[in-house]
Structure formats: structure tokens, C-alpha cells
């Protein structure tokens, strides 16, 4: 009987306060998170940002109990999914591979090899594809595969995105309906979908399908909710968790909350649409920061739809995904890891790869830029990184 | 039905080459591993040693495939033990808590709390108690419990050591017998028990029962082997993995190997007695370094008994331990974490706690000592740390 390994990929999160800095360093070291023209600056900048940013971030993790629950929840999801698949007669074992914290992808690959798995199904726990989430995880897995002959022998099938999965849509709709029904005036409640943002350039220049998938997904969910309840609620879709000076997908959730308050919304249901597990973005950013903004702007009843975690209908949807992936056409790791098109970094000036004039000019500019930033931050204790909200 | 959580404690090991340095830092930051008179020097010294030692250590991990298999094996042991306990009608879930690397004890505690466990059995995967292994893990768990009210509510029972466990002794004996039978002259083969060493002062000054338990354990195993085979093999017991300038338990394994070769031993069976999982000490130190010493000294047939890993008889022995712990008298975490007596650090001079003359004198001495070491190592690129084998 084929031994199937289901590799669940997610972001990872620090579980102890002292791990926050190293976690941030890993995150900002990824060129898919902060893009720089010369890779040589990646690690120093990652070190610099993570060092200066970690105390703020530590406070956020302190506020949710001292660490991220993501590993625990993801491992629970893995166990539940494994049981669901075995109940269907699929001899599956599930593994967890985090991108920026333990357990890392390397550990999962070692486990898969040791367990004599015949076929691997790669399932990112991001319903919507983005260069910076599923894309980064697929490419990490491909890097490990390139240098591991034993791993290369294994057949791999990938699930690239699954925002339209029936179980996922239905479980999101169910949880939203429960919150609507708990409102004083259910049909006057406003639904605020909030997704993790990405830089606008990812979508507009690099062709990241993320925004389209998020929009389609919100429509599918709202349609399901309306059909079930028999009435329509007003809704908005916005993006949260912006970092850095670049423009990200708009509207920003915090601005939408202010507008909704100003427009007289009294009962609000916030739906974290791109997160399937409770994490810092739901427990701290939405439940604490955004709630405060909402209440300050006149919203009285602030309700947040819980993340799916191990909601049985959702786990069943994941099992459907794995089952159809096994019987459907194979999507290779190369196809899944492929970027939509060449990412244009600086469209205003032609960029050339290699050690050439263009590179040297940019090298000088970036070095001066980073030097000035460091100078201000270190000497004056304030500067551009504080100004743009990175510190 | 009582939900039992079985907490398996072990050392932990880096799974990726880049994790070797941080792992060593964690290891040497533990005052149970390197004892200093003033805790303030602990972290700088840990940083210094781990930084300078990591490239040598990385090479060792490279030689065994790029990382430690300890997490993977320990999680396999956890799964097998869980199944064995459930087959006996005990509603058990097992958890892994590593002391110096991921998954850390904090993660296991979070999982235990989330799973609504009623009773925790703490089982160190060290058969023999030592201040620096089980002792350090018990105290780590106690520190976490002291600051966690939810965790304090949980009933905890500890297994302090289990070197005389029937399943453990029997499975060690079985594996040794297999190796003896594979020798050309089975009754002429020499058995070399090798245990992880500890500083002699732990045993002689602090009262660590480690050496006694190792000796008793070797006798139990050899007795079982003799009864089963019907003949006696010569055997020795020695200690490996010494680090630093201090005297450790003797004889040292490398010296014993030289002597055995000089005495004409041709077939040798090395038995890693204090390790229940394959790790750097078995796969690299014994299989590569000690094998080389043995072959260079005239030993022809060098055989190493495999670590127990998930050997069914061994897992069954662990299940016996958990079952009797649940029905037997309760050993609390405080009792398990207790040191045998106050550790005497510098018996040649009376040590007084607090900021007093004695502390200041030692402060000055240690600061000068560390400064001189750093100076030699950094400026000349060679010095005392190289000389004593730390680098």
C-alpha cells in the first residue's frame, strides 16, 4: 500500500520570548519578504531590523501569553488530517514544515525519508498563493531537494492554492454565520474581511495572484453566507500587517475600521480570511490593536471570527484536497515553486544582473542609504526606521 | 478516563549545520554543564566557547549527514511508547521536551496544557541519573512550573532513573548477544561499555549517583548476557566525550581502546551504555573517532552495538516504567529535581555566597583568566582553549 506523506507548510512562530529576535532575523533574511537589489545586504539588514524591532515584537507576543501558538495548532491540524485520511483508507502520515522557525523543513524531510514514504503531497496552509508565503515555502523545499539525492527519488505532488475548497469555504461561512446570529441586529452587522497584506509591487509588477485569489475567496464565502442566512450583510475587504515604507495592498484594515466607525457601523464582524490558525495577527493585531481602533471609532460590538484551527469541516476539506491531489494530475514542485514572471525590482531604472555598472551604482546607493539609517538610529536613537514604523 | 501525558526528556541536538553554534551556546549556558563561581560569566563564556568551537563541531555533524537525528528518533520513541500504553488501556499521549534544542520544554508544556491532560509522567530518556542530564531537565521543568499557574494545577509524577528496568537491560543484552554471535571467536570478543562521562567532582564532591548507577547497570547487563550465552566475555567500563580541562570519570574510552589493542584484543564490541538513541556520540565519536583509534591499535573486528531507538523490547520496558509510575508512590518534581547535596565548587578555598571578599577575589581571578584566554585565542589564533582541547 502506498505510504503517503502529507507535508503541511506554514510560516512558523517563536514560542518563547527569547526566540522572537532570531525568528525575525530568519523572516527578514528571506528575499521574498524584503527584496534588496544586492543579496549581500540581506543578512546585515535582517540582523539590523530584527535586533531593533524585537523588543516591540516581544511585547506583542507577551500580550498573547509569551509566544506563538502556531506550531502547536499546526501539529494538531496535522494529527487530525492524518486521522481523517486514514479513515478514508489512505495510508497517510503528516509532517509539519515551518518556513521561519522550528520545526523547519529540514526536519520534516528527514522524517519523511526515515518513514519510507512513497509519495509526498505538499499542502501549504495558506489557502491563497503568494510569492511571499506558499511560493517561498515551495522554493525552500526545492532548494533542499536539489542537494538531497535520497529526497529526489521521492515522488512529490503539490497543491498550489485552495481558496475555493468546499470545506474551507463552508467552514468559514459557518463560523461567520454564528457570529452574525449573535449580533443584536444580525442583518445590520458589517462583515470586515481582513487578509494579510503584501507589497503592491508583488501583485502589480511580479504578477502575484494573491489579490485575485483573496477577492474571489471573499465572494465565495459571502455568497455562501447569504444563501444560508437568507439576507445580505454589507462587507469590506482590507489588508493588514503592513511592514516597511513600501505601499502594500489597499485598503489597509486600520483605515477601513476608522471609516466604518465614522459611517455609523455599530456591530462589526472581523473575518481573518488568509489565516487558518490563530497567530499573532489574529490574537494580538486584530483582537487587541484593531479592536481598540474600532471601539475608539464608535463601533460598539466588535466580534472576531475564530481561526479555523481543527474545525472538523475544515479538516475534512483538507482531506478532500489531499485525496484529489493523489488522484488528479501531478503538479510538480518546480511548477508550484515557479514565480509568475520575473520580479521587477526597480522598474524606474533598467536593472541588470551581474557585477556591472548598474549593480555598482545600486551597491553604492544602498550602502549609503543603510549607513545613514544606521547612523541616525544608533547615534540619535531615532530616525527613518522609527519614522516609517519599522521600529 | 484519566488523560495521561508522558513527557519524554532528552538533550536535543542541532538538525542543521547552522544550528550547531546556537545549540552549543545553549549547552554551555547551563551551569550544570560548565560551573562558574559567578553566574555573570556564564553567558559570555558560553558565547565564546560556542563561537570558537562550532566549526569543529559542525565538521562532526557534517560527518553524520549534516545534523543530529535525536529529535526524529525521540519523536519516534514517543509515538511507539504512546501506542504501547494505549494498547494496555492507558489513555496516554506522549510529548518530547529537549533541554538544549527544539522542541524545547516550553513547547511540550504548552501542548500538555492544550490537550487537557490530567496527570503527567515525566520520563527522562537517560537511564542513569546525573546532575547534568536528568537533573538539569527536571530543574528546567520546575522553573517553568514555578511561573505557570495553569501548569501548577497539573499532577506530576517523575521517574528519576531506570537503569535497572527489565526491558532496558534485556534489550541491551539481546543486542550485545547478536554482536557477540557475529564474531569469529565469540567467547574471545571483548565487551567495552562506554558511557558519557561527567566531571569527577560531580560524583566525588556533589554526590552525583551517576557512576554507581552506570556500574550497577553494566553488571546487570553482563550478567544477563552471560546467562543467555552460557560463557563469559571479558569486559571494561569507560567514559567518553570529555570536554574541558577538568578531570572526568576515568578510565577514558580512548585510553582503554589503546590498552585493549596493546593487550592483544582482536574482536571488540563497543556498547554505548548511557545512550538510548543514536546521536553524535555514537555515530561520530564511537563509529568514526574511536573506531580509528581501535584499528590503529591492532583491533581487527570493531563492532558497535546499535542504540536502542525504537527496539520493541525497550519500548515495552518504557511502557512498564510509566505504568508502574502511575500506580506506585508519587515522586514529585521537587524530589526528582533535588541535587544530592550542595555542590562544592572550590573545595580548596572556602566559598561564600553574596557580594563579599571571597566573591570579589574570585571575580578578579576569573575575569583575568578569561581575558588572558581570549587574548591568546584572538590575537595569536592559538592558546589555552586549543591546548586543552576545547577548540
UniProtKB/Swiss-Prot annotation, chains A, B:
It catalyses: heme b + 2 H(+) = protoporphyrin IX + Fe(2+). PROSITE patterns: FERROCHELATASE. GO terms for biological process: heme biosynthetic process. Its EC number is 4.98.1.1. InterPro entries: Ferrochelatase, Ferrochelatase_AS, Ferrochelatase_C, Ferrochelatase_N. It is found in: Cytoplasm. Pathway: Porphyrin-containing compound metabolism; protoheme biosynthesis; protoheme from protoporphyrin-IX: step 1/1. Fe cation binds at residues 196, 281. It is an enzyme of class 4 (lyase). GO terms for cellular component: cytoplasm. One of its GO terms (molecular function) is ferrochelatase activity. Keywords: Cytoplasm, Heme biosynthesis, Iron, Lyase, Metal-binding, Porphyrin biosynthesis. CDD domains: Ferrochelatase_C, Ferrochelatase_N. PANTHER family: FERROCHELATASE, FERROCHELATASE, MITOCHONDRIAL. Belongs to the ferrochelatase family. Catalyzes the ferrous insertion into protoporphyrin IX. This is Ferrochelatase. It comes from Prochlorococcus marinus (strain SARG / CCMP1375 / SS120). The lineage of its organism: Bacteria, Bacillati, Cyanobacteriota, Cyanophyceae, Synechococcales.
